[in-house]
């Protein structure tokens, strides 16, 4: 029996009387997707080995042999020559088997005081911390690109919409700054999530800790963690840090999706506000005239995919008792795909934004439609003593009359406005200066406060956002 069991590949096989079926091996193996954690697995193992040697749990010679073997394994992985084996289940046992083949008993001693449960939790946190740093950098690049475009359009007037109906005129730079604000909060969320990712689970072992005299704080310091997970059961079993990351990622993609929707609308010939550079568009196999905004369209679609991963991870965790369960193997593919999707999307959008051509004349022409300055006329009357609700009603009468006359408010004479607004003996509240508030420039200039669309405020907001970006 001993000789038969010795032939089994699994590190845990001595407990069993028959080998695992090939179907189960394929069903339970994770090596073909968790191998992307390999370099972080090595990083964690080196810190663990250093701690074991420091604490006298293994000999210094064993630590040196482990370090030498891991250096060779790293080279093989980076060169693409490392042989990944399905029989060895996952990234951890593949690396351990290769290490043992090179370092002998020293390799077998590496797993002392450790379980794959706390090992994989450590690997994921190391990997995710690195990816968060990358995503934060990409968010900053996108914010910078939007600020550059906004700075070019602090006086370009575009209609602002509610319910996709023309509402009030704004400057295009102000519109773009709304997305800068969104992506700034996304950056803050990522950095906040990083704090909870940046805790060391290693040392929790399978679930209850270990009887060896380990030094978890030393390992945390070696790996750059801010501290250790304070409860061994929690350390190996929960993936809330990954779920929190995916929630923040879903919000990033939601903001990208909203921006994408507007890009698609703006590029439509029916709107014609912008053009997107050819390198970000595709054509049609049948319609030779087509230039399709595939990148923003696909970003909208990929947002649903990322949202689905978030729901999948929440569902994965909701029914698990403490501590670790095999269910958690299913955390990696949605997490990996979320990171890949967000990274690719942010990278391409940061490159695409500078190539947007703004058609300012079309924006202005659209802003002159739909009575965009109606609120300005109401405010004009309020400032002359009319209660706002009465002013609102008076301007509504004027808008209805313009519908019948097929003209804009600015096309009406002072006499027509006095007659149409139905103000009776208060008609003289409409003075000869009324048309100054009915111009697009007058409208945007009047919103001269923090957060408003006045060009000077937009310039100040851009400066503020650039300072925040530099922090």
UniProtKB/Swiss-Prot annotation:
<dbReference type="InterPro" id="IPR009049">
    <property type="entry name" value="Argininosuccinate_lyase"/>
</dbReference>
<dbReference type="GO" id="GO:0004056">
    <property type="term" value="F:argininosuccinate lyase activity"/>
</dbReference>
<keyword id="KW-0963">Cytoplasm</keyword>
<dbReference type="InterPro" id="IPR020557">
    <property type="entry name" value="Fumarate_lyase_CS"/>
</dbReference>
<dbReference type="InterPro" id="IPR008948">
    <property type="entry name" value="L-Aspartase-like"/>
</dbReference>
<dbReference type="InterPro" id="IPR024083">
    <property type="entry name" value="Fumarase/histidase_N"/>
</dbReference>
<dbReference type="InterPro" id="IPR022761">
    <property type="entry name" value="Fumarate_lyase_N"/>
</dbReference>
<comment type="pathway">
    <text>Amino-acid biosynthesis; L-arginine biosynthesis; L-arginine from L-ornithine and carbamoyl phosphate: step 3/3.</text>
</comment>
<dbReference type="InterPro" id="IPR029419">
    <property type="entry name" value="Arg_succ_lyase_C"/>
</dbReference>
<protein>
    <recommendedName>
        <fullName>Argininosuccinate lyase</fullName>
        <ecNumber>4.3.2.1</ecNumber>
    </recommendedName>
</protein>
<dbReference type="GO" id="GO:0005829">
    <property type="term" value="C:cytosol"/>
</dbReference>
<keyword id="KW-0456">Lyase</keyword>
<dbReference type="GO" id="GO:0042450">
    <property type="term" value="P:arginine biosynthetic process via ornithine"/>
</dbReference>
<dbReference type="InterPro" id="IPR000362">
    <property type="entry name" value="Fumarate_lyase_fam"/>
</dbReference>
<dbReference type="Pfam" id="PF14698">
    <property type="entry name" value="ASL_C2"/>
</dbReference>
<keyword id="KW-0028">Amino-acid biosynthesis</keyword>
<dbReference type="GO" id="GO:0006526">
    <property type="term" value="P:L-arginine biosynthetic process"/>
</dbReference>
<dbReference type="Pfam" id="PF00206">
    <property type="entry name" value="Lyase_1"/>
</dbReference>
<comment type="similarity">
    <text>Belongs to the lyase 1 family. Argininosuccinate lyase subfamily.</text>
</comment>
<keyword id="KW-0055">Arginine biosynthesis</keyword>
């Amino acid at each position: 029996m001993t000789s038969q069991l010795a032939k089994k590949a699994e590190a845990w096989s001595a407990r069993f009387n028959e080998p695992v079926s090939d179907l189960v091996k394929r069903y339970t193996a994770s090596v073909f997707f968790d191998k992307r954690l390999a370099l972080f697995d090595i990083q964690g193992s080196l810190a663990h080995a250093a701690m074991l040697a420091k604490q006298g749990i293994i000999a210094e010679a064993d630590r040196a042999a482990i370090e030498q073997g891991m250096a060779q394994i790293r080279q093989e992985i980076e060169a693409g020559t490392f042989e990944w084996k399905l029989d060895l289940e996952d990234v951890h046992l593949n690396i351990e088997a290769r290490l043992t083949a090179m370092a002998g008993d020293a390799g077998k001693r590496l797993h002392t005081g450790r379980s794959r449960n706390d090992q994989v939790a450590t690997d994921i946190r190391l990997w995710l911390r690195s990816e968060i740093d990358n995503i934060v950098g990409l968010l900053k690049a996108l914010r910078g690109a939007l600020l550059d475009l906004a700075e070019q359009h602090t006086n370009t007037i575009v209609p602002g919409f509610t319910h996709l109906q023309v509402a009030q005129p704004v400057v295009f730079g102000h519109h773009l700054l709304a997305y800068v604000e969104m992506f700034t909060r996304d950056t803050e969320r990522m950095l906040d999530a990083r704090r909870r990712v940046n805790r060391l689970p290693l040392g929790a072992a399978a679930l209850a800790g270990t009887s060896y005299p380990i030094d978890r704080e030393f390992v945390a310091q070696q790996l750059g963690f801010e501290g250790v997970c304070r409860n061994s059961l929690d350390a190996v079993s929960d993936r809330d840090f990954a779920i929190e990351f995916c929630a923040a990622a879903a919000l990033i993609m939601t903001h990208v999706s909203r921006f994408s929707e507007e890009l698609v609308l703006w590029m439509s010939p029916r709107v014609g506000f912008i053009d997107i550079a050819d390198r970000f568009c595709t054509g049609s196999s049948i319609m030779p005239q087509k230039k399709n905004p595939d990148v923003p369209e696909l970003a909208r679609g990929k947002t649903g995919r990322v949202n689905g991963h978030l729901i999948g991870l929440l569902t994965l965790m909701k029914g698990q008792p403490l501590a670790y369960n095999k269910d958690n193997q299913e955390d990696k593919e949605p997490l990996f795909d979320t990171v890949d999707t967000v990274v690719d999307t942010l990278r391409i959008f940061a490159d695409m934004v500078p190539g947007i051509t703004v058609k300012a004349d079309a924006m202005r022409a659209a802003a002159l439609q739909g009575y965009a300055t109606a609120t300005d006329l109401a405010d004009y009357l309020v400032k002359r003593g009319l209660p706002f609700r009465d002013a609102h009603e008076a301007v509504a009468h004027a808008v209805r009359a313009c519908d019948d006359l097929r003209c804009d408010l600015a096309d009406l004479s002072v006499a027509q406005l006095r007659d149409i607004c139905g103000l009776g003996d208060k008609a003289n509240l409409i003075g000869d200066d009324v048309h100054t508030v009915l111009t697009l420039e007058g409208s945007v200039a009047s919103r001269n406060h923090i957060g408003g669309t006045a060009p000077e405020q937009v310039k100040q907001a851009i400066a503020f956002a650039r300072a925040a970006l530099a922090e």
